[in-house]
Amino acid sequence: MKYLLSTIIFFISFISFSQDINFGDGEFEVKTNIDAVYTDDGDTYKISSSGDAGDYGKVYLSYKFTSILDTDGQGEFTGFAWAQQGEETQQATLQGVWKKQGNVFILYSLDSVTDGNLMMVSGVLDMVNQTLNFKVSPIQ
């Protein structure tokens, strides 16, 4: 009984010190239209899109979608973003995972921005309607 109680307390202490990712107060939407899609080999796809990114202004995105583990209907991506609002410009590196869900692709990403923000992103890539839209939030 003493051993069982010690084990339970041990595991509870790990849980209580675990880290959480907290969404920031500045959540915003990014709405883009797909400008181009292409592939060189039929396995890796590259997409570019442009649109509006809230306070970041006009945004241009480029993505490289892969499935390194060759899993059906899911994989990973990397990319780059460039945004401008007036004279201010920002850049971001994009990295995340994708999963096909019906006729769209669901994307989850953790991005690093030159203004010092780390962003958590969830989005929908709709190839039929040529849209790529996201909800973005700073990580606290």
Task: Report the location of each language-model feature.
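Positively charged n-region of N-terminal signal peptides that target proteins for export
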Residues: 1-4
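N-terminal signal peptide c-region/cleavage motif recognized by signal peptidases
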Residues: 13-15
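Beta-strand-enriched cores of mature, soluble protein domains
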Residues: 19-140
